[in-house]
Amino acid sequence: MRGNRLVEFPDDFWIPIPLDTNNVTALSPFLVPQDHLGSPTIFYSMSALMFVLFVAGTAINLLTIACTLQYKKLRSHLNYILVNMAVANLIVASTGSSTCFVCFAFKYMVLGPLGCKIEGFTAALGGMVSLWSLAVIAFERWLVICKPLGNFVFKSEHALLCCALTWVCGLCASVPPLVGWSRYIPEGMQCSCGPDWYTTGNKFNNESFVMFLFCFCFAVPFSIIVFCYSQLLFTLKMAAKAQADSASTQKAEKEVTRMVVVMVVAFLVCYVPYASFALWVINNRGQTFDLRLATIPSCVSKASTVYNPVIYVLLNKQFRLCMKKMLGMSADEDEESSTSQSTTEVSKVGPS
């Protein structure tokens, strides 16, 4: 077997396993099925998974956007960021998951080098915007409930500014590989594209880009989420102590605590695989690894287009009620009254 150190690869792909040929073009992920990387069962199973994520992710995020447009009461400035996240998720589902479904079915990157860059960029942009939207959601809730700025009123223009900020952050993280700082290449089983996590010591300066992503797109937003939600929980517990006789306040405090735990865990499930894999590659330069494992971070990230809307939208009683009406399903009167009551309770929380 010949190691990759002895094989010179083109700039548009790299295969991080030993190869038994000098003619790497014959194994190009843009030209031939990658049967040497895994059995057909693995490729077809991944194709089926990507199809499910494409259909479910597209449907749930389109429904979120359509529901917001139809029902005026959902067009609250505090819901702007949820719609912003739905748009970002829709980009990932419609470009990333759909193309992966096709490519895994053919067992190679049928889009070619240019299509790979486009798919990698759009999926990265949508993913980064969604990631920063989670941090903004935490920040907005901290700002509104904990009131660290006193009588500051969070208005529509502030919400729009926060949404715009997520796209600026997303572009800062997704544009560099297009202009020479890292690059977009086929990743994992070579049927999806993303930033080059694999190669080191070359003209693309991948190590510095990976560290930039780890700090700017993982450590910073995660710190924001942990800080804001910990402050929010502290405020709620203080309010619950002050209203110890109020069963509804105690119930609201428990529900919010449970939701915060779910939100933080969901963030970690989505982005820890990418972060840990990138750091492992940097600290184990030149080591080969199982490409099936390298495919996991991309799959988990694309799955977030489904489970994040479930957590942030479908578990929102107001959104859920409107979606039921939009789909012609009977709305539960108890649920509607519960929605109104929970909204009232939340509005009472926080320092006066």
Curated annotation (Swiss-Prot):
Sugar attachment sites: N23, N206
Tissue specificity comment: The color pigments are found in the cone photoreceptor cells.
Domain of life: Eukaryota
Record keywords: Chromophore, Disulfide bond, G-protein coupled receptor, Glycoprotein, Membrane, Phosphoprotein, Photoreceptor protein, Receptor, Retinal protein, Sensory transduction, Transducer, Transmembrane, Transmembrane helix, Vision
Sequence segments annotated as region (Disordered): 332-352
Bilayer topology term: Multi-pass membrane protein
Protein name stated in the entry: Blue-sensitive opsin
